[in-house]
Regions:
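Structured, basic alpha/beta domains of bacterial-type, RNA-associated proteins
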Residues: 2-108
Length: 108
């Protein structure tokens, strides 16, 4: 198992209940593929640099996970099927960032 960080951008108009459901479905997916979610951080609603699927804002979430690298493509496929996720990116890291990250801290 190797370390990965996964960032998901959800549609901005989702209720907190739907966001929680997407979050739990994602965690279940990762567990089903033999991975483990170590930490997660909600970055909240942020402006997008450019429009994605007609959205100018997105709700960001970060997941730190350990998973077999061969299973990342399966995770990507399941994320592509989730209609409430407008973009996602999983990257391999040597070690996980300490939380809270800069993105997760409130602006002054």
């Amino acid at each position: 198992m190797q370390h990965f960080e996964l960032v998901c951008i959800l549609k901005p108009d989702l209720t907190s209940q739907i966001q929680s459901k997407v979050n739990s479905n994602l965690e279940k997916s990762i567990n089903d593929f033999g991975g483990k979610v170590l930490n997660q951080e909600i970055w909240g609603l942020k402006e997008l640099s450019y429009t994605i699927k007609k959205n100018k804002k997105g709700f960001y979430m970060l997941f730190q996970l350990d998973i077999d690298p061969k299973k990342i493509s399966d995770i990507n496929k399941s994320l592509n099927l989730e209609e409430n996720i407008i973009r996602h990116l999983a990257i391999k890291v040597d070690k996980h960032e300490k939380l809270p990250t800069i993105m997760g801290q409130p602006k002054n």
